[in-house]
Amino acid sequence: MAPSVISLRSHNSFSLSVSASCIKVADTQDKLIEEWRVASASQEPVLLLGEGSNVLFLEDFLGTILLNRLKGIDIREESDGWYLHVGAGENWHQLVEYTLKCGITGLENLALIPGCVGSAPIQNIGAYGIELQHVCDYVELLDLTEGKTIHLTTEECQFGYRESIFKHQYRYGFAITAVGIFLKKEWNPVLNYGDLAKLNPATVTPQQVFDSVCHMRRSKLPDPVVTGNAGSFFKNPIVTKQHADSILREYPNMPQYLQADGNVKLAAGWLIDQCKLKGFQLGGAAVHEQQALVLINKSNAKGSDIVELARYVRNQVAAKFSIQLEPEVRFIAAHGEVNAIEVLS
């Protein structure tokens, strides 16, 4: 095997100094299949990557990084709305901006979420009351071994909170090539979270929602270009109402969001903040001083520094609230993705 010599610093938003044996760029489906088969034939591990905004490299990757750069935005207008067919390699935030400029509304709450369009279904990205599943029409997937295209409806994607079938059945050997999005012409602003609740639903415009979301994200989340991070490190935990009520008795101002099934979603950042961990540092990694949900590469951190910090944060929250936080970020070891919860346990 070739030595690990190609830097991945610019391909992971934590800006960790890790490397790979090889990096290949695929801008067509044929190229994706070809590079996958070449790497697989040499018995090397292969990792499909978008913009590396939701991964933590624990160490050097001993194989090929395959960058999915399939582009293109096709828009079809119908009487009730717009149907978009978007290449997996398109930047998500740029798509949100583009639709707004075209007078197409519905993606404003998802502004400034980092990463590629193809990564959006994997996590079922969401923010400020909207998730991808609310606007997703279908996902196109490529079976890299058979060379066949698979068309999945929204239901078949099995979307959940930061969850989808792409983390399970289609995790390895498949590449998302395009995402279908349907946006209704009848615009109903979702103004339930943060500063959006201050806006008047009767007069607010899509541009104002977009601007407000961008302002909120920029004010509390560090720019990965300046400070290495992967955004929200942990998922917001969902607990029983009984568990939430027991915490509420001691912390009556705790933010909580009742779910359709009767359970309650809590704010992971708030839980971490109650443990007085903002600014806490281990090795080169630290908890961000403004947003406790974000772990940062403060000073030439290694992957192991971020793991140690995440484990410490998780243990503190568990000790105080009897809640086990789950990472939202995907953990990548030398030969591929590993179970993040097992790494932290």
From Swiss-Prot:
Top EC class per UniProt? oxidoreductase
Q: Quote the catalytic residue positions.
A: R162, S232, E328
Q: Which InterPro entries match?
A: FAD-bd_PCMH, FAD-bd_PCMH-like_sf, FAD-bd_PCMH_sub1, FAD-bd_PCMH_sub2, MurB, MurB_C, MurB_C_sf, Oxid_FAD_bind_N
Reactions accelerated catalytically:
UDP-N-acetyl-alpha-D-muramate + NADP(+) = UDP-N-acetyl-3-O-(1-carboxyvinyl)-alpha-D-glucosamine + NADPH + H(+)
Q: Which SUPFAM superfamilies match?
A: FAD-binding/transporter-associated domain-like, Uridine diphospho-N-Acetylenolpyruvylglucosamine reductase, MurB, C-terminal domain
Localization recorded for this chain is: Cytoplasm
* EC code(s) of this entry: 1.3.1.98
Q: Name one GO molecular function term.
A: UDP-N-acetylmuramate dehydrogenase activity
Which residue ranges does the record assign to the FAD-binding PCMH-type domain?
Answer: 16-186
Q: Which family does it belong to?
A: Belongs to the MurB family.
Matches recorded under HAMAP family: MurB
- What protein name applies here? UDP-N-acetylenolpyruvoylglucosamine reductase
